[in-house]
Amino acid sequence: MPEITVRAKSKTYPVYINEFALEDVREKWTESLAKFSHVFVLTDEHVAELHKAKLDAVLADLPVVTYYVAPNGEEAKTFRVYEDVMTKLIETGLDRKAVLIAFGGGVIGDLGGFVAATYMRGIPFYQVPTTVLAHDSAVGGKVAINHPLGKNMIGNFYQPEAVIYDTQFFATLPEREMRSGFAEMIKHALISDQTLLRALMDTFTEPKDFYTKDLTPFLQRGIEIKANIVAQDETEQGVRAYLNFGHTFGHALEAYGNFGKWLHGEAITYGMIYALTMSEAIYGLDFDLAEFKTWLKQLGYDTTFDATVPFSKILENMRHDKKTTFNEISMVLLEEIGKPVIFKAEDDLIFETYKRVMRNGGNGI
């Protein structure tokens, strides 16, 4: 079974990925889990309905397993749900020898990791992602919940014991969720590898390809790209910020939509178009943005921007971005495909880029 090793400064751990990963690691994993005093599984309503029975079968021989089922979507990454999970842990009597399993998409991984990082100052946890989007969020140790004023504003860096990535869960993902996760695959290609980007564009040309073409080698490559960056910079003091390409604008848009109007990958797609447009203006990026947007449209993405979204709100939310320091907004831009840079953007440039993007396609958000 394909295995990728993540070598962060704080911990080294494996990422197991294939269509039957849970079955393939079952014996070894349950032996490890049996050493803990209690297994606590955090999932959401959707995943519990579709896949709980599969995880139950894997955990069947363990004596003490407790589930917490969170709401679907970004609603799970709130103070209210975080407190409720903590209350459940305390009432259940979990001690420091317990372990948490985050079983779901990126939201559950973020919430579960943050719960594990903060309960009794830290208990071990495993990531068992069920979505394409989670190939990015499950690896690297970023864990967080949202604040009404910004995405992932309350969090930590806390690495899992392992990531068990069973791709057969993708079969039940709606097309919109598949597309959202695929956006992070595009991001990895843009910041690292022109050849990878071309392979994505040649392989995936319509929405049905998400289900009929093999995603696994592209997911593996994306995880390898992220693992290499995390090995250099676990806590985002330098090159790890490159993984935020498209996220400064994208997170601002998510916050404007109250973390519900757009899925993460949808917002990041707008953010990547925005960042590519600024990269053309600042660095003369040699990139066929028109071809790129046409490809995105073929895959079902909406690439046009809505003039009714007030720029003032987007700018305000960008100021709350974690990369903003000394009131200077940091953008991840591209000098060329595969060559990201950090650029301190003035308000005038941010607005001019917004206007340029609007001129090239509006009224769609």
From Swiss-Prot:
Gene3D superfamilies: 3.40.50.1970, Dehydroquinate synthase-like - alpha domain (1.20.1090.10). GO terms for cellular component: cytoplasm. Keywords: Amino-acid biosynthesis, Aromatic amino acid biosynthesis, Cobalt, Cytoplasm, Lyase, Metal-binding, NAD, Nucleotide-binding, Zinc. Its main location: cytoplasm. CDD domains: DHQS. Pathway: Metabolic intermediate biosynthesis; chorismate biosynthesis; chorismate from D-erythrose 4-phosphate and phosphoenolpyruvate: step 2/7. It is an enzyme of class 4 (lyase). Zn(2+) binds at E184, H247, H264. Pfam families: DHQ_synthase, DHQS_C. It catalyses: 7-phospho-2-dehydro-3-deoxy-D-arabino-heptonate = 3-dehydroquinate + phosphate. Its EC number is 4.2.3.4. GO terms for molecular function: 3-dehydroquinate synthase activity; metal ion binding; nucleotide binding. Binds 1 divalent metal cation per subunit. Can use either Co(2+) or Zn(2+). GO terms for biological process: amino acid biosynthetic process; aromatic amino acid family biosynthetic process; chorismate biosynthetic process. It comes from the Bacteria. The keyword Aminoacyl-tRNA synthetase does not apply. NAD(+) binds at G106, V107, I108, G109, D110, T130, T131, K142, K151, F169, F170, A171, T172. InterPro entries: Dehydroquinate_synthase (IPR050071), DHQ_synth_AroB (IPR016037), DHQ_synth_fam (IPR030963), DHQS/DOIS_N (IPR030960), DHQS_C (IPR056179). Belongs to the sugar phosphate cyclases superfamily. Dehydroquinate synthase family. NCBIfam families: aroB. Catalyzes the conversion of 3-deoxy-D-arabino-heptulosonate 7-phosphate (DAHP) to dehydroquinate (DHQ). PANTHER family: 3-DEHYDROQUINATE SYNTHASE, 3-DEHYDROQUINATE SYNTHASE, CHLOROPLASTIC. This is 3-dehydroquinate synthase. It comes from Listeria monocytogenes serotype 4a (strain HCC23). The lineage of its organism: Bacteria, Bacillati, Bacillota, Bacilli, Bacillales.
